[in-house]
From Swiss-Prot:
Similarity-based family: Belongs to the antibiotic biosynthesis monooxygenase family. Heme-degrading monooxygenase IsdG subfamily.
Protein name (record): Heme oxygenase (staphylobilin-producing) 2
Native species: Staphylococcus aureus (strain N315)
Gene name as annotated: isdI
Alphabetically ordered keywords of this record: Cytoplasm, Heme, Iron, Metal-binding, Monooxygenase, Oxidoreductase
Record-annotated site: Transition state stabilizer: 66
The ABM domain, residue ranges: 2-93
Nucleotide-binding among keywords: no
InterPro entries assigned: ABM_dom, Dimeric_a/b-barrel, Heme-degrading_MO, IsdG
Length: 108
């Protein structure tokens, strides 16, 4: 199994609104190999909010298929970093993607 983490640094006070955007999934569940998604808010941050999107996949290839899919492009077409100079406000200050091999998983 494989896990991808997209770690978002957000303007303070924007985490809840960002999380709510995930209530209406936009196709990730249709990608072969997708298994689970967790969207988390880091507690007790000071200057910014932090939201992590954790997705579980059968394999890294499944995740890469998602990244290269038209479904991914469509789902992310309106996502902008705050630094993008297009006149639209975005709470996203930065993001970084981390990849993990899952060595052990237990679920009750």
């Amino acid at each position: 199994m494989f896990m991808a983490e997209n770690r978002l640094q957000l303007q303070k006070g924007s985490a809840e609104e960002t999380i709510e955007r995930f209530y209406n999934r936009q196709g990730i569940e249709t990608i072969e190999g997708f298994q689970q998604m967790f969207v988390t808010k880091t507690l007790n941050t000071e200057d910014t909010d932090e939201v992590k999107i954790l997705t579980i996949w059968e394999s890294e290839d499944s995740f890469n298929n998602w990244l290269n899919s038209d479904v991914f492009k469509e789902a992310h077409k309106n996502v902008r970093l705050k630094s993008d100079d297009d006149g639209q406000q975005s709470p996203i200050l930065s993001n970084k993607v981390f990849k993990y091999d899952i060595g052990y998983h237990y679920q009750k």
